[in-house]
Regions:
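Short beta-strands within extracellular/lumenal beta-sheet-rich domains
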Residues: 18-33, 109-111
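Short amphipathic, basic-aromatic surface patches that mediate peripheral association
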Residues: 42-53
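Extended extracellular/luminal ectodomain segments enriched in beta-structured repeat modules
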Residues: 32-42, 121-123
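Boundary/junction segments of secreted and surface-exposed precursor proteins
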Residues: 1-18
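Aromatic- and Gly/Pro-enriched, solvent-exposed loop/edge beta-strand patches characteristic
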Residues: 53-157
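Hydrophobic residues on conserved beta-strands that form the core of alpha/beta folds
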Residues: 26, 38-40, 113
Length: 180
């Protein structure tokens, strides 16, 4: 995002994360110093849309949350592995912004959400939820993946991500091979 300067940016190698429709997932980020009024937000996704049902328009919806929810005790601070009782991170809580659904484009694409105009706290979680794809089988022609990875240029982010489904929020490390 930017007003007078970039408050978070990362360059990346490709790391794709696929989740079933109805699951939000995204990155917790610590924003750079200075004003944190975000006007624009961009994220990258990859989608395969060749077998999407006729008349269906697959979409992505961006949400930005303050990390002011309950304390999450699911990561052990000593080992940085999920399942520990000592991590103490705050879960995403207050919804600060929700975009209109953006129509997906096949292949790799950068999606820009403009006219946000929200003041952000120092730590937020941004998520994307896909709709109109099933994500059951990569290569099925009806999947979408959020691109998560990177070297932080401005601000910072750990090697983990938040997932929200019907059971609530869970934190996973990017290197973890098992998600619920």
């Amino acid at each position: 995002g930017q007003i007078g300067g970039v408050i978070y940016n990362s360059t990346h190698t490709t790391y794709e994360a696929y989740f079933k429709t109805g699951t939000e997932f995204g990155d917790e980020i610590d924003l750079g110093v200075g004003g944190r009024r975000v006007s624009e937000f961009a994220f990258e996704a990859y989608s395969e849309l060749s077998n999407v049902a006729s008349g269906t328009t697959p979409t992505a919806t961006l949400k930005i949350y303050a990390n002011d929810g309950a304390t999450y005790d699911g990561v052990d601070i000593g080992t940085q592995q999920t399942g520990g009782a000592n991590y103490g991170a705050k879960m995403p809580g207050t919804l600060l912004f929700k975009s209109d659904a953006k129509a997906l484009v096949a292949g790799f694409h950068t999606y820009r959400v403009t006219d946000i105009n929200v003041d952000l706290p120092a730590k937020v979680t941004w998520t994307v939820e896909f709709d109109g794809v099933d994500n059951d089988t990569v290569g099925s022609g009806k999947t979408a993946a959020l691109i998560l990875a990177g070297t932080d240029d401005v601000g910072s982010s750990l090697d983990d991500f938040w997932q929200k489904d019907a059971s609530g929020w869970k934190l996973y490390r990017s290197g973890s091979t098992v998600q619920d």
